[in-house]
Curated annotation (Swiss-Prot):
Protein family per UniProt: Belongs to the ferredoxin--NADP reductase type 2 family.
SUBUNIT field: Homodimer.
Source species: Salinispora arenicola (strain CNS-205)
Alphabetized InterPro entries for the sequence: FAD/NAD-bd_sf, FAD/NAD-binding_dom, Fd--NADP_Rdtase_type_2, Ferredoxin-NADP_redctase_2
Protein name, UniProt field: Ferredoxin--NADP reductase
Enzyme superclass (EC): oxidoreductase
Amino acid sequence: MREIDVAVIGAGPSGLFAAYYAGFRGLSVAVVDALPEPGGQVTAMYPEKLIHDVAGFPAIRGRDLIANLVAQAAPFDPRYLLGTRAEKLTYVDGRPVLGLAGGEQLACGAVVITGGLGSFTPRPLPVAERFLGTGIVYFVPQPADLTNRDVLIVGGGDSAFDWASTLQPLARSVTLVHRRERFRAHAATVARVRALPVRIVVNAEVTRLHGGGTVTGAEITVRGGAAELLPVDTVVAALGFTADLGPLTEWGLRLDRRHIVVDSTMATNLPRVFAAGDITEYPGKVRLIATGFGEAATAVNNAAVVIDPAAHLFPGHSSDGS
């Protein structure tokens, strides 16, 4: 059985910053994630997209943000346990023991859960499933692959508009279709896309895709109107994701609609178990990468005091003594 001060579950931005902060506090740390590389949803879903709401960066690509976070934690030598998943939580002498897939166990001083949305599955576009991999995509790891393509984006959230903004300079044409008139995306993101040569069609749905082995066109039907056939060779379905917390639901955590309820110290209802990032829920919660960073620091600082009651909650600034 391995022993570690802090086990971080989830290697997304919040988890990577928690790993840095645990090291900064002189704590040994292991980071567990089911994905094969660090970065969580950023790496899996939008590594090339520009992120505009991280403090200090007017814009930064997803993969660059993750690389910076990994480099920031590197001096403290966090142990990455990737491609595996935390399945069980038990206690021995009041300390958490994580059971990992494959049978390995981690004895921890504290656990910090930063699993984002848990495991995530894209919501399907019903008319498009037979073209999956041959014209219909849910992620665009390499936007340059869509250079000179006619791209149809389906959805009205931030991801849909972010893809429109990212792909417009590359693609031959970009059309965004949403089944409602109002968008879930941030108003500034919508305004940025409206200023681009992107066609936006509201109150409409994709009712049929054309093509043999690959997509060649899409029928769009506006509510109460006739269908319009567009030349399309790539459809980006940005319809959101269904989240699955997996084994976490069996640990006895207090949950609220697939989120872990925490208090102002980021503590859960379980002893020595904290959480941070998108997976958490509390009054006034805002799900941003930026807020996840602060929550990660709060969780680790409070975990440090639980591990060693003689420790100070506030460890000083990282610039002290420099």
